[in-house]
Amino acid sequence: MAASALGRMCGAAREKLSPGPGARGLGALARSLVLALLLVPVLCSDRSENPPNNATVSSPVVVTAPGNHTSPSVSQISTTLSPASAEKSGSSSAAPTPTAAPSAPEEEADSNEDPSMEEEDLLALNSSPATGKDTLDNGDYGEPDYDWTTNPRDEEPEDINIAISKESRRFRGFQDSVEVVKLPPPNREDSHFFFHLLIFAFCAAVVYVTYHNKRKIFLLVQSRKWRDGLCSKTVEYHRLDQNVNEAMPSLKITNDYIF
């Protein structure tokens, strides 16, 4: 796109400056300067992106001296620019391929080395237990001798075990006491309960009757005492009794009376 635009501008300038020889020299110089100014940013960008391509692009674009009023043609510019663009596209498209290519040989090398490495590892593992046994037999661990003195921290688990054993004994004793105290069957419990209920009801009835008839009971007991102890059954007593009954006939109705 830049080459076509530059070609169009150069053709228009050539047509305008064609009338005189002096004008042709000035026009050629002006065109060379304009082309140089236009191509400077393009060349800078090309150098930053692809340094090897700068030599190919910068070689044809050479500004001639003021004495020689010649400048490169548009065809040369287009031909010099097109390989650069082609090389850019080719480099961009071919850039990922070199990264993918070395991976395959590395994988093949890994696959070729894996069996041998695995065999070596297996041999090392098979040979390592023997050395471990030898070191265990010899007792040389590369460490100082173990101090067999008792440590208070080491005694803590024993205290814990003693406490646990005591708790287990207490729990077993509690279980034994619970097993000893067994409740009777439900039928026996019901029968005993009914029997106790009858006894309690009888006692309550006796207390109730005696409380409400306490005066009568007291009079009955006292009258018997008077008759048995104090009042003798003599002739005088019978006469007095007859006289009282005759004088008070209403006393015959009641037997309980006090003299």
Curated annotation (Swiss-Prot):
Q: What is the species listed in this Swiss-Prot or TrEMBL entry?
A: Mus musculus
Q: Signal peptide position in this chain?
A: 1-44
Per the record, the gene is Kct2
Biased-composition ranges, Acidic residues, are: 105-122
Q: How does it sit in the membrane?
A: Single-pass type I membrane protein
Q: Record's Gene Ontology CC terms? A: membrane
Q: Any idea where this protein resides?
A: Membrane
Residues that bear Phosphoserine: S165, S223, S250
Pfam families per UniProt: KCT2 (PF17818)
Bias class Polar residues marks the residues at 50-81
Recorded protein name is Keratinocyte-associated transmembrane protein 2
UniProt keyword list: Glycoprotein, Membrane, Phosphoprotein, Signal, Transmembrane, Transmembrane helix
Q: Glycosylated at which positions? A: N54, N68
Q: Tell me the segments the record calls region Disordered.
A: 47-155
Q: Which residues lie on this side of the membrane: Cytoplasmic?
A: 212-259
Q: Does the keyword Glycoprotein apply?
A: yes
Residues spanning the membrane: 191-211
Q: Which residues lie on this side of the membrane: Extracellular?
A: 45-190
